[in-house]
Amino acid sequence: MKTSDYLKKYGVKLKKHLGQVFLSDDRIAKRIVKEVGLTPEDVVVEIGAGAGTLTEELAKTGARVIAYEIDESLAPVLRERLSKYPNVELRFEDFLKAKDIPEGAICVSNIPYSITGPIMEKIIEWKFKRAIVMVQKEVGERILAKPGKKTYGYLSVVVQTFYEVKKLFDVSRSCFVPNPEVDSTVVDLRRKSVDLDFEKFRKFVSMIFAKKRKTLKNNLRPFLSVFEGVDLSRRAEQLTVEEIVEFYEKWRRALECSKE
C-alpha cells in the first residue's frame, strides 16, 4: 500500500503548525538506508516517523529502530504499516524532550522542516555517532557552507565543529505528500572526537554571529580585554571553524578565570 493510501484510509489530516510533509517515494527511503549500511546490531533513532515510509525501510535491516512521532493521529498508520517488525519501537512524543537516547545510536531522519534548527542542536547534544538527515535544500546548503559564503553562519559552525559533513544527494519535492515548495538534500554527518561544552560553545557562536555584517570587535565588545593583541577586524563569516574554536577557548578560559 502506498503512503498516500495509508493516509486516506485513516483520514489523516495534515497539521500546518507541524509543517508536515511525508516522504512518499520508497525509492528514496531505500537509497537513504543503503547509504547508512545498517546491521542488526545497530540502534537507529528516527525523528518524525510521519507515515512510516522511511521507518519501514529502516525496519527491514533488522536494526533496532526507535521512531519518534509527535502527532498521535498517525498512530493507526504507523502501527498497521510496521506491525510485522518487532524491532521497531514507536514513541509518540516530542523528540526535543527525549530523555533516554541509547549511547552509540545512529540518527536517520527526514527532519521536520519547521524545527530543523532545534533538532540539529539536539543531534549534537545527544552525541549521535552518525546522522543521515534529509533537510530543506537551503538548510543543507547552510550545514555544508564554507567561510566567506552567504550561507555560512551559526548552523554551519556548530554542526561542522562536531561533525564531518558530506552531501549525499538532492531529493525532488515531488517525492513528498503534499509537495512542499522546495527540494530537499540528504546530508551525512559523522561525529568528530571533540571535547567542547556544547551549550557554552553554542552561546559563543550565537554571539559572534548575532550581527553578521559586524566585525568581531563589535560583536565581542564586552570581552575586548580577553582578545588583546588579537586581530578582531574580520567578521565571523570569514573565520574557519577551527579559528572560531580558538576564539571560543580564549573566551571560555577568561570567563573561568574571572570566576576564581
UniProtKB/Swiss-Prot annotation:
Catalytic activity: adenosine(1518)/adenosine(1519) in 16S rRNA + 4 S-adenosyl-L-methionine = N(6)-dimethyladenosine(1518)/N(6)-dimethyladenosine(1519) in 16S rRNA + 4 S-adenosyl-L-homocysteine + 4 H(+)
Transmembrane domains' residue ranges: none
Keyword Methyltransferase (UniProt): yes
EC number: 2.1.1.182
UniProt keyword list: Cytoplasm, Methyltransferase, RNA-binding, rRNA processing, S-adenosyl-L-methionine, Transferase
Catalytic class of the enzyme: transferase
GO molecular function, one term: RNA binding
Subcellular location: Cytoplasm
Matching Pfam families: RrnaAD (PF00398)
Main location per the UniProt record: cytoplasm
Binding site for S-adenosyl-L-methionine: 23, 48, 69, 94, 110
GO cellular component terms, A-Z: cytosol
InterPro entries: KsgA/Erm (IPR001737), rRNA_Ade_diMease-like_C (IPR023165), rRNA_Ade_Mease_Trfase_CS (IPR020596), rRNA_Ade_methylase_Trfase_N (IPR020598), rRNA_adenine_dimethylase (IPR011530), SAM-dependent_MTases_sf (IPR029063)
Gene3D superfamilies: Ribosomal RNA adenine dimethylase-like, domain 2, Vaccinia Virus protein VP39
Family: Belongs to the class I-like SAM-binding methyltransferase superfamily. rRNA adenine N(6)-methyltransferase family. RsmA subfamily.
PANTHER family, per the entry: DIMETHYLADENOSINE TRANSFERASE, DIMETHYLADENOSINE TRANSFERASE-RELATED
NCBIfam families: ksgA
HAMAP family from the UniProt entry: 16SrRNA_methyltr_A
Function: Specifically dimethylates two adjacent adenosines (A1518 and A1519) in the loop of a conserved hairpin near the 3'-end of 16S rRNA in the 30S particle. May play a critical role in biogenesis of 30S subunits.
The protein's name in its UniProt record: Ribosomal RNA small subunit methyltransferase A
Top-level taxonomy: Bacteria, Thermotogati, Thermotogota, Thermotogae, Thermotogales
